[in-house]
Amino acid sequence: MKILYSLRRFYHVETLFNGTFVLAGRDQETTGFAWWAGNARLINLSGKLLGAHVAHAGLIVFWAGAMNLFEVAHFVPEKPMYEQGLILLPHLATLGWGVGPGGEVLDTFPYFVSGVLHLISSAVLGFGGIYHALLGPETLEESFPFFGYVWKDRNKMTTILGIHLILLGLGSFLLVLKALYFGGVYDTWAPGGGDVRKITNLTLSPSVIFGYLLKSPFGGEGWIVSVDDLEDIIGGHVWLGFICVFGGIWHILTKPFAWARRAFVWSGEAYLSYSLAALSVFGFIACCFVWFNNTAYPSEFYGPTGPEASQAQAFTFLVRDQRLGANVGSAQGPTGLGKYLMRSPTGEVIFGGETMRFWDLRAPWLEPLRGPNGLDLNRLKKDIQPWQERRSAEYMTHAPLGSLNSVGGVATEINAVNYVSPRSWLSTSHFVLGFFFFVGHLWHAGRARAAAAGFEKGIDRDLEPVLYMNPLN
C-alpha cells in the first residue's frame, strides 16, 4: 500500500486516515476519497449510495415529524400561528386541516396525526437506509438490474429522470385531489375573511396559466408569484401534473437525441450539479413566493407581507382619524400630497404617505373597499366592516421585520416586541439555501466539466512545494 507522505507523518494518530482501518471498497485507497468526503466514496457502489440516500430521506422525514409534534405541543390556539414562530402548522392549515372561518384553528388533532405519520415513515426509511448502507449488496447491477445503473449510460439516466418526473407529477395531483375532493383547501379570499372551501371552477386555460410564466418578474407584474386566486393555483397544478407525468413517460421511452448527448456532461458529478442548480432555482422562487404572496401563503397563518403590513397601517389610521372627524378625501399631508389618499401613477385612488410605494398590494381585507378606480371614497366612509379594522390593526403591528437571530421589530424602535414573522424565517432561509446550492452547482459543474475534459486532478502533486520541505517536527 502506498502511504501518502502526510499520512506517514501522523502514523501515531489513530484516525480513519490510517490504512489499518479499511471499509471494504470505501477507503481512500480504493475510491480516491477519504472518509470525510462522504458519499463521494460511494459513486460507483449503487447499493451503498442507495442506503445513503434512503437514510438521508429518513433524516428529512424525521425532522418533519419531530418538528411537527414540537409545534403542536407548543401551540396556543388563542394566538395567531405567526406569533408563535410556527413554520409547519401554517402549511397544514393552508391545506385546510384543522381550521375554519377566518383561519381560526378548531382542531389540532390532524396536526398531531401528520407528525406521527412522518415519524413512523422516518423509522421505515431509517431502517431501509441502515440496511442498504450496512447489510445490502454493495452494487445493485448484478442482482437487481432494474435498479442498477452506470452513470454514463445515457438511456438509463433519462429513464431514472422519467421515473422522478412521474412521481413529481403524482405529487402535484395529490394537491389537486385535496382541493377538489378531500375537504378543500384554505382560501384567504373567501367572503368575510377566509374559509376552507372545495375548489370547483378550476382555471385550465393555457393562456392564463402560461401567461404567468410570460409576465415580467418586476413590480406590478410579479411573474408566477403574482398568482392571487386558488383556481389558478390548483389549475396550475393540474397542468404541472400532466406535464411532469407525460414528460416522465417521454424520458422513459426515448433515448437522448444527438444534440443532448453532445450538450450535457454524462457523469454522476454532472447530475449532482444539475440537481443543485434546480434546487437553487426552487429556493429563490420559494423565497419570493413566501415573501410576497398572500394567497398560497395566507396572512392568517404566515402573518402579513411587508407591503400588506404597511398598507394596513395607513388603513388603520385612516379609520381612526375619520372617526375623529378628518375628511380623509381632501386632507393634505406634509408634502402637499394627500395625507390619507392620493392617486397612483395610473390614476387609481391609493393610500397616501410612505405606503404609496406599495399601492399595488392586493389583500382580502382591503379589496372589498375598492371600486373601478381604486379605493372607493364612498365605501371608505360607509362600508368598512369591524373585521377589516381588526385585521388591519393586527397586521399593522406584525410587519415581517426582524433578523434571523430572532431579534424582532424595527432596529430603531425602543418599544419593539420580540416578534419575527415566519415570512422572514422562510424567505431568508430559502434565499440563503438557494445561494449556497447555486455555489455548489458551480463547484460541481466545474469539476464535472474538468473531469470530462480530462484535467480534473488540479495541481500536479509531484511538483507541490510542500513535498520538498522539512517536516515541522
Swiss-Prot record:
Subcellular location: Plastid, Chloroplast thylakoid membrane
Bilayer disposition of the protein: Multi-pass membrane protein
InterPro entries recorded: PS_antenna-like (IPR000932), PS_II_antenna-like_sf (IPR036001), PSII_PsbC (IPR005869), PSII_PsbC_sf (IPR044900)
Organism encoding this protein: Lolium perenne
Cofactor note: Binds multiple chlorophylls and provides some of the ligands for the Ca-4Mn-5O cluster of the oxygen-evolving complex. It may also provide a ligand for a Cl- that is required for oxygen evolution. PSII binds additional chlorophylls, carotenoids and specific lipids.
Pfam families on file: PSII (PF00421)
Positions of post-translational N-acetylthreonine modification: 15
Modified residues (Phosphothreonine): 15
Residues that hold [CaMn4O5] cluster according to the record: 367
Keywords: Acetylation, Chlorophyll, Chloroplast, Chromophore, Manganese, Membrane, Metal-binding, Phosphoprotein, Photosynthesis, Photosystem II, Plastid, Thylakoid, Transmembrane, Transmembrane helix
GO molecular function: chlorophyll binding; electron transporter, transferring electrons within the cyclic electron transport pathway of photosynthesis activity; metal ion binding
Residue spans crossing the bilayer: 69-93, 134-155, 178-200, 255-275, 291-312, 447-471
Subunit structure: PSII is composed of 1 copy each of membrane proteins PsbA, PsbB, PsbC, PsbD, PsbE, PsbF, PsbH, PsbI, PsbJ, PsbK, PsbL, PsbM, PsbT, PsbX, PsbY, PsbZ, Psb30/Ycf12, at least 3 peripheral proteins of the oxygen-evolving complex and a large number of cofactors. It forms dimeric complexes.
Protein name, as recorded: Photosystem II CP43 reaction center protein
GO BP annotations listed: photosynthetic electron transport in photosystem II
Its job: One of the components of the core complex of photosystem II (PSII). It binds chlorophyll and helps catalyze the primary light-induced photochemical processes of PSII. PSII is a light-driven water:plastoquinone oxidoreductase, using light energy to abstract electrons from H(2)O, generating O(2) and a proton gradient subsequently used for ATP formation.
GO annotations of cellular component type: chloroplast thylakoid membrane; photosystem II
Prosequence residues removed at maturation: 1-14
Family assignment from sequence similarity: Belongs to the PsbB/PsbC family. PsbC subfamily.
